[in-house]
């Protein structure tokens, strides 16, 4: 039996992603876990523009792809699987040919789950870290795809790329 250093404690888990895994880790150590996700990650309400972007990408629209989140890459594939499964293989083939630049460990892990790896990983998993990594690259004339997330664009990164 594992030690129970958290026995008698109630721990609120405000995580959304991997909540069950995190809760189970705490419960194995004796904690009573209250799941209270504060953030909901939702798919785009209209899959049409997402699918169009995926089709463009599969048609070799990018030389480089900057992946900011692993969740975003997995959700692109889930959208493809739900709405146009025939697009999955061409999308993955294009992803394999494209130089993949990751912001942190989560997009790198998502790539590994697909049998791929990042070509360039930011030294720091921040917007500034990715910009610093990009400064060392010659991007002029290259078609760069940027995975955005949320409702606000990443202005510093978008402005750097322009």
Tell what function each PLM region has.
Residues 1-162:
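Signature of uroporphyrinogen-III synthase
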């Amino acid at each position: 039996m594992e030690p129970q250093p958290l026995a008698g404690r109630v721990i609120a888990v405000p995580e959304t992603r991997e909540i069950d895994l995190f809760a189970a880790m705490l419960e194995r150590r004796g904690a009573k876990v209250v799941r209270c996700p504060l953030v909901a990650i939702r798919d785009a309400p209209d899959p049409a523009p997402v699918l169009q972007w995926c089709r463009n990408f599969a048609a070799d629209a990018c030389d480089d792809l900057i992946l900011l989140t692993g969740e975003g890459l997995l959700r692109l594939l889930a959208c493809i699987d739900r709405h146009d499964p025939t697009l999955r293989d061409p999308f993955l083939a294009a992803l394999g040919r494209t130089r993949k630049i990751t912001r942190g460990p989560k997009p790198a892990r998502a790539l590994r789950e697909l049998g791929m790896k990042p070509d360039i990983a930011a030294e720091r998993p921040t917007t500034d870290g990715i910009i610093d990594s990009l400064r060392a690259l010659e991007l002029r004339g290259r078609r760069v795809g940027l995975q955005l997330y949320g409702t606000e664009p990443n202005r510093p990164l978008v402005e750097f790329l322009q």
